[in-house]
Amino acid sequence: MIYAKSNPKETLREHTDALRKELETLKNCYGDKIEILTNLDKEEFWRLLDIIVEFHDLGKVFTPFQNVIREKIGEKKIDTPFENDIYHNFISPAFINYKKLNIDKDLKEVIVQSIGYHHERDVIIDNDLKDKIQKILDEDILNQVNKLKDDFHVKYEIKEKSLRNTYLKYMEKRIKPKDENYKLYVMLKGLTHRIDHSASAHEEIELNADENVGEYTERFFKNNNYELREVQQFAKNNRNKNIILKASTGMGKTETALIWIDNDKSFFTLPLRVSINALFDRVSKDDIKYNYAGLLHSSSLDYLEDNKYSDYEDRVNQSRLMSTKLTFSTIDQIFKFPFMYRGYEKEFATLAYSKIVIDEIQAYSPEICAVLIKGIEMIHKIGGNFMIMTATMPAIYENELKRRGVFDDNLATRTFNTDIIRHNVKVEDMSLDENLNQIVEQGKSKKVLVIVNTVKSAVDTYEKLKNINDNVNLNLLHSMYIQEDRVKLENNIKEFAKNENIGIWITTQLVEASLDVDFDVLHTEVSTLDSLFQRFGRCNRKGLKLIDSPNVFIYKKEANGIGSIYDKDIVNKGLELLEICINEKSSKITEDDKLEMVEKVYSEENLKGTEFYSKFRKALEILDALEPCQLSKNEAQSILRDIESDTAIPIEVYEKIKYTYIKFYEDLNELIDNEYKKENKNDEYKKYLKSKRKEVKRDILKKTVNIPAYRTKNLGVITDIPIKGLENIKILNYKYELQEDNGRLKGKGVVIGEELINFV
């Protein structure tokens, strides 16, 4: 018997057949989309993929590999002089009989790399490795040929008499974008990853392929007697094209994207998890009731569990496998492929036959926008479809997409702005601190939102307002609350905005693009124009309130974070344009005015010489020069998360959970270790303990905050937790303040020092 897996026990034939079943599912669901992406005859493409699947794990016949499984399932090991120190995927291509399989010489490299790298290892193929593999082929693998034929029943003819390591020469240089068969390679190798991962997880590779989100969205419109707006009709008419769509807040961009997606597999991205969660709820259960969507970000499991979604673990696993029909995701989960990390082809091949929606592109840093633009270029070249939706589109990004050939006959671009004027803007020649009394007075009769640029500034403003009048309904929200408290506060601000409450909320730009809230008045520190206009969108959102007097106040003096968070030159240029618009036109700013100003301030002419421009161009240069497979998946993901951060529990919170969650986690570690030491292992009990440990770790993570590592480096405020499995969680030696007051959460969160003054 030749084994492939130990838990659950699975023979090589069973595992390979499971892959072939997923291949058929993929072909039936999206075969027509996949077939047009390569220059091969469609039947030949599927034949090659079937060959790769059949051969991918033949190297597992290697005796030491079989012994690893035999030991785990309680079977006697086979005598062998070899160690299990050569990966099975490096052996599998040895069996391919190219002549019998009628594989052209120029496709050998594609086939060998698709099989040989279906598990990615950071291994250099040198002469020592080649010699070692040849010895294994001669002294071990050749003796297994009959077993493969009799036990595995190979579907295709294999090499039997002489197994040579010559195929390794096809693995020495990775296939690059400029190579002739690059597209074919991406599709074959990428889909091999997908098929293998789904079969190994015993999950279907594609789910609910017939559930059309466009139909669900139009049904929602019909049931509520809504007509399709012009923007939605535009998307419907251009379903077969790529789209760049500029539309103001409240135009129905989400529904527009869903109508464009229609019956295609799709991925919908947004900058922040909280906004993705809200959108996922709207589409899954609140409005559209499309219950076939996945949610994919670093805390999606917690969110689905906390919000009582059934089968939440299955849903997250399916999203990670990219199996869901529609997936709501942060870009770090699905947009790593421009780094061409080891294994990037899985992501790239999947996006190639899907539609991808990028919402609010202007909300990302210039470096991340460079990654998105590089990714859009790659998707365009391979034949995939994208939609960029944004309220404001910096001209520098459009120009770069034009340079990269993305603006072609298959691209539709339109701007849809509402004629409703929602904001009467006053630029104050003072600091926010100088106008706190007016803010308090407004808070006694209106919903007032105060947005500042840093956590430190938010906390200071909160304290000062509290000292002026402790009776006003005063609330604080920023990123330095532990996860579970931040979720509660985010829910509180959403509820506050919905009901008849009056009072004041002080926040950072956390609220800009993430929370769907509507206030009467906005007071904000100056920032870049795109950021300011995002903030405007949290005031008089629907344009139903009178704006005879100013409802937006911008404070241009002593604003925090200028030069550290926001580029000083871009802030000043934007402020200059805004003041010209107010003085020469009107303080009642239209949506067209906003778009025009952002395009001007982010034109290449204006940006040259700024740090923003330098970061954007440098990032593109690095991406363009990258060689395939230099980075690992984790390294690519870390770059996309924009910042290296420490996940830490504030010391006071840690002291409260030290003898509960932390102790329980330690106890579970010990129980699992003991179970591994037993001769008669109870696999079910071990599985239960591991599941419980994972659950406890999720509870511990809810007690953490994320702090940029560079902010706390060398300050001595971070301490390790010396427990196996919790090494990546730290203790933060700062106070934590939050208490419940008459059913409301009150407090500053992590009480930070001057060293974190510019933290957002």
List the model feature ranges, each with a label.
Residues 2, 536, 542-760:
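C-terminal accessory region of SF2 helicases/translocases
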Residues 2-212:
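Accessory nucleic-acid engagement/destabilization modules that flank
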Residues 265-276, 443-466, 476:
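Conserved strand-helix element at the start of the C-terminal RecA-like helicase core
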Residues 83-86, 480-483, 487, 501-549, ...:
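Conserved RecA-like helicase motor core of SF1/SF2 enzymes
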Residues 346-355, 361-415:
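Post-DEXD/H (motif II) to motif III coupling segment of the RecA-like Helicase ATP-binding lobe
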Residues 395-443:
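Interdomain hinge/linker at the junction between the two RecA-like core domains of SF2 helicases
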Residues 265-287, 297-300, 395-397:
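Conserved Walker A/P-loop ATP-binding site and its immediately adjacent core
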Residues 239-260:
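Walker A/P-loop
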